Curated annotation (Swiss-Prot):
Cofactor(s) listed: Mn(2+)
CDD domains: AdeC (cd01295)
Catalytic EC class: hydrolase
Top-level taxon of origin: Bacteria
Family: Belongs to the metallo-dependent hydrolases superfamily. Adenine deaminase family.
Record carries keyword Methyltransferase: no
Protein name from the UniProt record: Adenine deaminase
Annotated gene: ade
One Pfam family linked to the record: Adenine_deam_C
EC number(s) given by UniProt: 3.5.4.2
Gene3D superfamilies listed in its UniProt record: Metal-dependent hydrolases, Urease, subunit C, domain 1
Subunit structure comment from the entry: Homodimer.
Keywords from the UniProt entry: Hydrolase, Manganese
């Protein structure tokens, strides 16, 4: 854990220090004073009464001794509880289908003042140009948007076709950028454990920063070896004892609650007063509909308090201070003198009802963010351009031949989990011996002209129609699920025509589709319009059967080989436990 003060992230000039000290001493006028407020004490528990004094970007003082201090402006908190701004410890903004600018507009008014982002989705499509755009967005954002340098592009060498590489030389060019906090999730954990030099070179290059992990279900000597390599955290834990063991071995535990991977209920019982400095909250992948209707990190805090009886100061601690401390962002995470004034005022701390947000010492106005969004997006120079180098397909591209009496592998979906099971089904003249089997195909979209990789999918709930998307982790090829080859082809051709996006087909017609013009991953629409479009897509998808809560996000992970057990990439069926390709027909 990175506990030392990292001056890379704490930019304050000597002149600012002198002004801040003068206000702290009571010798100068504050910019803002927040009155009639209680401050939740994340260290000791309980509350501190008294004003919060702000000068520039920083807190100059806290407590009753500043009751009569002068200020240019006073903010009446009306009895609110003040907590530090919320921090998401690990996410891919691209999974929200929003640009970083739109994401800020949607989440900053909810108290999310800081994000630790790995932009490996767009980097897999566009390479360094995608990372550079995220850096430009971070530089101009009010929200603290920090970046972890994507470490595994593609996720696993030789297992899929992606759009670009991101070499160590390119990675090093970004290491000293002021918004870079470390190395993003090291997904090739077998390579790390076996000591592959190319991976150890990456870890060594970023060892003075924070090294993110990714090791679902890992245990025993393999987990020990992975941690020995220097990996500091993991967001992929999905079982209680798995999370406990990682904490015991010195890892920090990121408790994830996204739109597809929902691990909070399993892991929340671990959190206590002792280990909470080692526990953090993250969303990883959360779509705009859930952000609009349920919230972001605020929703996770609410559930910790209401459903798991986590004490207030502990719930807010894991949502702010623990993460700031882990990433060496020592100017964040507490409402204390000298810390950055990222403040969330809550009218109800138990329900996480946000009354007002300040970031870097300035109050946030949601309407102003919305009004400025278009101009700020243009200023960031988004990397527009069609990234779909694929010709239209026909139903014959998805034709599979099955032999009666033979057994075939089936990717079995677990609703609201990223892991799958590997099962099999026997084919007869009447079809498969289970009625929930659909067809799945992955089509590379980067001009390699490969035939579609085809397989079988169980448990997804698709009774009719087809779903297609260019959001498919991490290479973001075209993934399609369907009950008929004709409808699969129709869905794929719609997303090709859109230059990337999502599509639902039923009754031989496109029922709903959403173009994603930036890298086939992100929309340029407002958060509200995007949420409405997602609502329409989900409604159309529900007509196809009892699908997962977030069918497109769940579908997006069916091609990610670094999460077990059975996945389908553009190269074929991949056994995520043996880390090797396998065949559709079971022959052993």
């Amino acid at each position: 854990m990175n506990n030392s003060i990292n001056h890379k992230f704490h930019h304050i000039s000597r002149a600012e220090y002198q002004e801040l000290l003068a206000v702290s001493r009571g010798d100068a006028v504050a910019d803002y004073i927040i009155d009639n407020v209680s401050i939740l004490d994340l260290i000791n528990g309980g509350e501190i009464s008294g004003p919060i004094v702000i000068k520039g970007r920083y807190i100059a003082g806290v407590g009753a001794e500043y009751a009569d201090a002068p200020a240019l402006q006073r903010i009446d908190a009306r009895g609110a509880t003040a907590v530090p701004g919320f921090i998401d410890a690990h996410l891919h903004i691209e999974s929200s289908m929003m640009t970083p600018v739109t994401f800020e507009t949607a989440t900053l008014p909810r108290g999310l003042t800081t994000v630790i982002c790995d932009p490996h989705e767009i980097v897999n499509v566009m390479g360094e140009a995608g990372f550079a755009w995220f850096a430009r967005c971070a530089e101009q954002a009010r929200q603290n948007q920090y970046l972890q340098v994507s470490s595994c592009v593609p996720a696993l060498e030789g297992c899929d076709v992606n759009g670009a590489s991101f070499t160590l030389e390119q990675m090093l060019a970004w290491r000293d950028h002021p918004q870079v906090t470390g190395l993003a999730e090291m997904m090739d954990y077998p390579g790390v454990i076996s000591g592959q030099n190319a991976l150890l070179d990456k870890l060594d290059a970023f060892r003075h920063l924070t090294l993110d992990g990714h090791c679902p279900g890992l245990g025993g000597k393999e987990l020990n070896a992975y941690i020995t390599a220097g990996i500091e955290n993991c967001h992929e834990s999905y079982q209680l004892e798995e999370g406990r063991r990682k904490l015991q071995l010195g890892m920090s535990l990121m408790i994830r609650e996204g739109s597809a991977a929902r691990n909070l209920n399993a892991l929340a019982p671990l959190i206590n007063e002792f280990n909470s400095p080692q526990c953090m909250l993250c969303t990883d992948d959360r779509n705009p509909w859930e952000i609009a209707h349920e919230g972001h990190i605020d929703a996770l805090i609410r559930r910790l308090i209401e459903q798991h009886n986590v004490p207030l100061h502990v719930a807010y601690r894991v949502a702010s201070w623990s993460t700031a401390r882990h990433f060496g962002l020592n100017h964040l995470g507490l409402l204390a003198p000298g810390k950055q004034a990222d403040i969330v005022l809550l009218s109800d701390a138990r329900k996480v009802t946000v009354q007002q947000v300040l970031v870097k010492g300035e109050p946030i106005d949601a309407q102003t963010l919305q009004a400025e969004e278009s101009a700020r997006l243009a200023q960031s120079a988004p990397p527009y351009g069609n990234t779909i180098a694929r010709q239209p397909v026909s139903a014959s591209d998805f034709a599979l031949q099955f032999t009666p009496g033979k057994r075939y592998r089936v990717i079995d979906v677990i609703h609201n989990e990223l892991i799958t099971h590997s099962h099999s089904s026997v084919y007869s003249e009447n079809g498969f011996d289970r009625d929930d089997v659909s067809f799945i195909a992955v089509l590379e979209r980067y001009g390699q002209r490969l035939a579609p990789a085809c397989g079988l999918l169980g448990g997804f709930g698709l009774n009719e129609g087809a779903l297609a998307a260019t959001v498919s982790h991490d290479s973001h090829n075209i993934v399609v699920i369907g009950r008929s080859a004709e409808e699969m082809a129709l869905a794929v051709n719609q997303v090709i025509q859109d230059g990337g996006g999502l599509c639902v087909v039923r009754n031989g017609q496109v029922q709903s589709h959403l173009p994603l013009p930036i890298a086939g991953l992100m929309s340029t629409d407002t958060a509200q319009l995007l949420a409405e479009q997602i609502d329409a897509l989900k409604a159309a998808a529900r007509e196809c059967g009892p699908l997962p809560d977030e069918p497109f996000i769940q579908m997006a992970f069916l091609s990610l080989p670094v999460i077990p057990a059975l996945k389908l990439t553009s190269q074929g069926l991949f056994d995520g436990e043996k880390f090797a390709f396998t065949t559709l027909e079971v022959t052993e």
